[in-house]
A protein has these predicted regions:
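Sec-dependent N-terminal signal peptides
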Residues: 3-14
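Short, solvent-exposed, Trp/other aromatic-anchored flexible loops in extracytoplasmic proteins
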Residues: 73-126
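Transition segment at domain starts
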Residues: 15-44, 124-127
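Asparagine-centered strand-capping/turn motif at beta-strand->loop junctions
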Residues: 48-54
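Residues at beta-strand starts and edge strands
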Residues: 41-43, 58-60, 108
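Short acidic/proline- and small/hydrophobic-mixed sequence motifs that coincide with surface turns
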Residues: 55-59, 73-74
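Intrinsic-disorder/low-complexity, polar/charged segments enriched in Ser/Thr/Lys/Arg/Asp/Glu/Gln
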Residues: 42-46, 94-97
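Beta-strand signatures of extracellular beta-sandwich domains
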Residues: 61-65
Length: 127
């Protein structure tokens, strides 16, 4: 009887799976991300991040999780944004944008999880 009660209590938890969403880290938040589809093929994605921290950001890395309309995971890719010769650092309150190639079959949506942030003072968080 205890075993049956245990499974009955766990059953509602199986339906409580939250839908995919964007995840920021250390004050760097995902403002928007969407996949670029051409003739039914996912060719890449656009990402817009915002530096809501009190420090200046010079690099961000993330994992892009690709889903279809049924929220089935179709694939994962890593991406990164870095300041350099043509790209300025992101001061507090500023945004960062990037466009990445992907080529994930059947993907219609992309959700971003920021995995690492590097600041100009040499500190970082994540991995």
């Amino acid at each position: 009887m205890k075993l049956v009660s245990f499974f009955v209590l766990l059953l509602p938890a199986a339906w409580m799976v939250s839908p995919p969403s964007h995840t920021g880290l250390c004050g760097v938040d995902v403002v928007k991300a969407y996949s670029q589809n051409i003739l039914g093929q996912n060719v890449g994605y656009y990402i817009n991040l915002k530096n809501n921290s009190s420090k200046t950001v010079d690099a961000v890395s993330w994992t892009a999780n690709f889903y279809n309309n049924f929220e089935d995971l179709k694939g994962k890719k890593t991406g990164k944004w870095e300041s350099g010769n043509f790209t300025s650092v992101a001061e507090p309150g500023e945004s960062m944008t990037d466009l990445e190639g992907a080529w994930i079959d059947g993907a219609t949506k992309v959700f971003i999880k920021v995995t690492r942030v590097h600041f100009t003072d040499g500190s970082s968080c994540g991995k």
